[in-house]
């Protein structure tokens, strides 16, 4: 599935350094505002130990991990919603993303200029959030002007419903609250999503801490501020050190593990960020396995077997007959598909089956 998270934040908070680490690419990461002029998109592999275990069992000719896309979006500044800095085109770039990774500076460094000259995570978060709120308010007000008359004069059911949803959202935005803070039922939420509002998108606050705070971010007062804000908003918060992550991304796997061990941590901040993005977007993984290939596929929780088959090839969904399914935890226990069959662990599932995280599937189809 082509889903992506946009990396946003004020200039010089570490967005491009983080992006370099995520993709092991080398976009410009200069020490001045707006080093990123066009959004850079990059694909990152999703590290999943289940893939490694499946490879050790099937010894395939080819291995393909699941992927996730991140987009580095230029630094926003106060007034961006009114065209300041690089303005509305970058707010438009965020609209194309499924989730927002909001990078917040949580380190002191006199050599890296802060756009407001001081490090203040609370102020920085408020600056970005207000710009997104102001941009959404403009969208909502324009839409209200189109449906208000119809809702009040014709009493058309859909127009009334849309006006009520927009009014709820506008009230929140007027109070400087994001659209995601509004309580909406399933139908109302579906309607709200059609406006592609920035503040309706799920958010991960990425606290970019110093090298000294990497192993124990909870000791960093700046991180604690970001965590407190995230908890209050029911958002996610992931501490990282972009400089260390960029360094780790260039190391061979064994050296990376040794470096992590020397730092006193078990996984990279980037792995945590990717897995948090997965969870935030309600994503899971199924597998296709065999001697030719072991591949991980991303799907949205709640998708049926035919829909998941369609992520492999559209013909698989059109001509879907059934899927032979077993869990990867069972293959890890029984070691071979033959042993799974003898134990009755391979199921035949039809069109209504909802795929589960960790399913291994063989699709039967006819076109």
Which functions belong to the PLM regions below?
Residues 2-8, 13, 19, 146-354, ...:
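C-terminal-of-GTPase-core extension/linker across diverse P-loop GTPases
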Residues 1-111, 147:
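Conserved G1/Walker A P-loop phosphate-binding module
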Residues 16, 33, 69, 73, ...:
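Generic signal for short, ordered secondary-structure residues
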Residues 6, 34, 39-42, 49-51, ...:
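Short capping/connector residues at structural and topological boundaries
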Residues 34, 48-51, 64-70, 84-97, ...:
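Amphipathic alpha-helical transducer elements in NTP-driven molecular machines
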Residues 25-33, 40-42, 50-53, 82, ...:
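Glycine-rich, flexible loop/turn motifs
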Residues 42-47, 74-84, 95-159, 172-185, ...:
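Conserved Switch II/interswitch segment of TRAFAC-class P-loop GTPases
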């Amino acid at each position: 599935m082509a889903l992506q998270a946009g990396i946003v934040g004020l200039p010089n908070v570490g967005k491009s350094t983080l992006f370099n680490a995520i993709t092991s690419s080398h976009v410009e990461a200069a020490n001045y505002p707006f080093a990123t002029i066009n959004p850079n998109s990059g694909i990152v592999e999703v590290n999943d130990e289940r893939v490694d275990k499946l490879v050790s069992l099937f010894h395939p000719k080819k291995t393909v991990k699941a992927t996730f896309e991140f987009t580095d979006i230029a630094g926003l500044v106060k007034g961006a919603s009114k065209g300041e800095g690089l303005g509305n085109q970058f707010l438009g770039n965020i609209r194309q993303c499924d989730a927002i990774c909001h990078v917040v500076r949580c380190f002191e460094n006199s050599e890296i200029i802060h756009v407001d000259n001081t490090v203040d995570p609370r102020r920085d978060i408020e600056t970005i959030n207000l710009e997104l709120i102001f941009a959404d308010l403009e969208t909502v007000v324009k839409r209200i002007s189109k449906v208000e008359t119809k809702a009040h004069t014709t009493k058309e059911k859909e127009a009334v419903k849309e006006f009520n949803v927009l009014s709820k959202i506008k009230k929140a935005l007027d109070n400087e609250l994001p659209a995601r803070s509004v309580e909406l039922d399933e139908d109302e939420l579906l309607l709200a999503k059609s406006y592609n509002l920035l503040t309706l998108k799920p958010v991960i606050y990425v606290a970019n801490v110093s090298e000294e705070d990497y192993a124990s971010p909870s000791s960093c007062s700046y991180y604690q501020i970001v965590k407190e804000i995230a908890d209050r908003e029911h958002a996610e918060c992931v501490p990282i050190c972009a400089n260390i992550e960029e360094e780790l991304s260039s190391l061979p796997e064994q050296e990376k593990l040794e470096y992590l061990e020397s730092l006193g941590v078990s996984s990279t901040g980037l792995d945590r960020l990717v897995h948090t993005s997965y969870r935030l977007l309600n994503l899971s993984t199924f597998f296709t396995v065999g001697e030719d290939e072991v591949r991980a596929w991303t799907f949205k929780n709640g998708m049926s077997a035919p829909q998941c088959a369609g992520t492999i090839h559209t013909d698989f969904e059109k001509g879907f007959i059934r899927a032979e399914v077993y869990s990867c935890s069972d293959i890890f226990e029984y070691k071979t598909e033959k042993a799974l069959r003898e134990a009755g662990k391979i199921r035949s599932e039809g069109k209504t089956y909802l795929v589960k995280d960790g399913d291994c599937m063989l699709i039967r189809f006819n076109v």
